[in-house]
Amino acid sequence: MINKDSLTHHISQQFNAELEDVRSHLLAMGGLVEKQVNDAVNALIDADSGLAQQVREIDDQINQMERNIDEECVRILARRQPAASDLRLIISISKSVIDLERIGDEASKVARRAIQLCEEGESPRGYVEVRHIGSQVQKMVQEALDAFARFDADLALSVAQYDKTVDREYKTALRELVTYMMEDPRAISRVLNIIWALRSLERIGDHARNIAELVIYLVRGTDVRHIGLTRMKEEVENNRGE
């Protein structure tokens, strides 16, 4: 089992510093992505095209952070040939940055929908769903990053479990909005923008779950992807304290 103290156990202080640096860079990228998601949701709800444009402009910075962290991981793998928990840390970081970058992409899509809705003027049906699901996925991203920062497999498990709730509520919202469009065809264009924004939010939840699963792999040493929530819970609880 890995914890924060594990990062300081190497004879080489330089290796300790390299591991802590790349982990810190991941969390810094995560903080920026988390802000991007929050701002995208607020831009959509508040019809703030200026804030939406800021979200889209951050995308290049996030992409550059992904490339930089990838390079750090490659250098550590080549120079240090890490094993055991160190190797799991590098693998988890290198995969998590992919999900963070994709969360940023989805936030940018939400911002684009916000700009389009601002241009159309009239507020469409669906903002209640955006506010609700947006709040849920914001919490998932925040807690997935907190779990990574604290090496907390239990918190990571709760993020993965919560993804089912988001998926269920997304499907419910989708049915309601499709019904609304059938009743008022004049609203189709506007409501479609809301539907696509909700789809991006649902995908953000999926990527937050991916990061949570990587935290469990990092801390417990077990790959829990594709095994279902019941077995995932068993793996986390059975390996607790090892």
Curated annotation (Swiss-Prot):
Highest taxon of source: Bacteria
Subcellular location: Cytoplasm
The entry's keywords: Chemotaxis, Cytoplasm, Phosphate transport, Transport
One cellular component term from this protein's GO annotations in UniProt: cytoplasm
Family annotation (Gene3D superfamilies): Phosphate transport system protein phou homolog 2, domain 2
Entry annotated with the keyword rRNA processing: no
Record Pfam families: PhoU
Phenotype seen when the gene is deleted: Mutants are constitutive of alkaline phosphatase and show chemotactic response to phosphate regardless of wheather the cells are starved for phosphate.
Biological process terms in GO annotation: cell chemotaxis; intracellular phosphate ion homeostasis; negative regulation of chemotaxis; negative regulation of phosphate metabolic process; negative regulation of phosphate transmembrane transport; negative regulation of positive chemotaxis; phosphate ion transport
Keyword field contains Metal-binding: no
GO molecular function: protein homodimerization activity
Subunit text: Homodimer.
Free-text function comment from the UniProt entry: Plays a role in the regulation of phosphate uptake.
Family according to the record: Belongs to the PhoU family.
Protein name: Phosphate-specific transport system accessory protein PhoU homolog
Species of the source: Pseudomonas aeruginosa (strain ATCC 15692 / DSM 22644 / CIP 104116 / JCM 14847 / LMG 12228 / 1C / PRS 101 / PAO1)
